Structures are given as structure tokens and as C-alpha cells.
A protein has these predicted regions:
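Rieske [2Fe-2S] iron-sulfur-binding domain
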Residues: 1-62
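C-terminal catalytic domain of Rieske-type non-heme iron oxygenases
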Residues: 42-203
Length: 203
């Protein structure tokens, strides 16, 4: 939409007001079921981010949102904390995808697996539950922050997770060899935040 007024029916016949009135408009595009608008100068719009969740076909992305009653920075901080999953997302048992049912959307966390190593299955739920004191390191990157998390599981096996914090509001988490989560935290005001989450499957 260009913002051009098409009609002013309450104006007298012959009025040219509608030709002079314009509503401010902003370009909007849709990606993975979410609308994105650029509110800055039209000639200064940056390239749209080439994240996996926007490049993958819609059949491989599940997106949802929620309204959180907290500041966006609080939401961002808890999401990039690699230790919180061992406590706030702890499952006492593990479930393969086949056991979740016919609609697995949003439940992939429970079925994500590192595979079979040394005759043992290592679903992510087990990794998070049994190894809750990881070694965490941080490195500055041009886009923000890289967080490397190491969970030593056996003398031969270490779980490595690299999270990218893309400032000011996005981070990408690799959940398994075939699944990533991209989260965005959009401030509404000082105490409310819209949280957008994109599960992208490469399977």
C-alpha cells in the first residue's frame, strides 16, 4: 500500500482533498508466517536477514509467538543462557517423535537426538537432564555474541552447542543435527515483549 487516499466521501462534490492527503505507509514482507515492517527511511532499509528459518520452505518451519510480561532484555538473556534448559525445560523421561502423536509441531525438543553412540541413545532431553553444569564460554562477533557450551558426557563424547546472539533481539540455537530454533524478542514497552520462535527442520 502506498498510503494514497482514494476517496473522501464526506467532502463536497469536486473536492480534491483526497489527492492531497497521504497516510504514512511502511513496506511489509511476510516470512515463515510472520509479517516484518521497515519503519525507517525507505532508502535505508537493510537487506532482510538470511536466517535459516526464512530461507527454508514453509513445510520445514514452524513459527509461533507469545506475549511475555517482562522487558525484552530479560527475555533475551534467559533465552541465550545455555544452562537454563537443564532446569526450565527438564523432562523426566524421553520420547521419540513417533510417540508424540500425529501433530509434532512445537514438540520437537522432546524428540531431537544426538543419535546412537557407544550403544546408547542420547536424546536432547537426556543430555539436558543429566549434564546440568556445562562449561560456557563467550566470544564477541560482528553480529553480537557467540556462546559455546560444552557438556562432557563420557570420556569419548562431549556435547557441543554453539549459540549465536544476533543483536539486538535475535538468537539462533542448534537443537540437534537437523533442527534449529531462531528466537526474536520485540519490545512492546518497558514491561512487555513479543516473543517469536521459529523451529526449522533440515530433515
Amino acid at each position: 500500500a502506498s498510503g494514497r487516499c482514494l476517496d473522501t466521501p464526506a467532502e463536497p462534490v469536486g473536492s480534491k482533498l483526497c489527492e492531497r492527503v497521504r497516510q504514512t505507509s511502511y513496506p511489509v514482507i511476510e516470512r515463515s508466517g510472520v509479517l516484518f515492517g521497515w519503519f525507517g527511511a525507505p532508502d535505508k532499509a537493510p537487506p532482510f536477514p538470511a536466517f535459516d528459518c526464512f530461507a527454508a520452505p514453509s513445510t520445514h518451519v514452524f513459527a509461533f509467538k507469545g506475549l511475555w510480561h517482562c522487558n525484552w532484555l530479560q527475555a533475551f538473556e534467559v533465552g541465550i543462557d545455555p544452562a537454563h534448559t537443564s532446569f526450565l525445560h527438564r523432562f523426566l523421561n524421553d520420547a521419540p517423535l513417533a510417540a508424540i502423536g500425529i501433530n509434532p509441531a512445537g514438540k520437537q525438543f522432546r524428540s531431537a537426538s544426538l543419535g546412537d553412540f557407544g550403544g546408547e541413545q542420547w536424546p536432547m532431553t537426556r543430555v539436558m537432564r543429566e549434564f546440568h553444569q556445562p562449561d560456557i564460554s563467550f566470544e564477541a562477533r560482528p553480529w553480537g555474541l557467540q556462546i559455546t557450551t560444552l557438556r562432557s558426557m563420557t570420556p569419548e563424547l562431549t556435547h557441543v552447542r554453539v549459540t549465536h546472539g544476533i543483536f539486538p533481539q535475535t538468537f539462533v540455537i542448534p537443537l540437534s543435527p537437523t533442527l534449529t530454533i531462531t528466537q526474536m524478542h520485540v519490545p512492546v514497552d518497558d514491561t512487555h515483549t513479543y516473543w517469536f520462535s521459529f523451529f526449522t527442520s533440515f530433515a
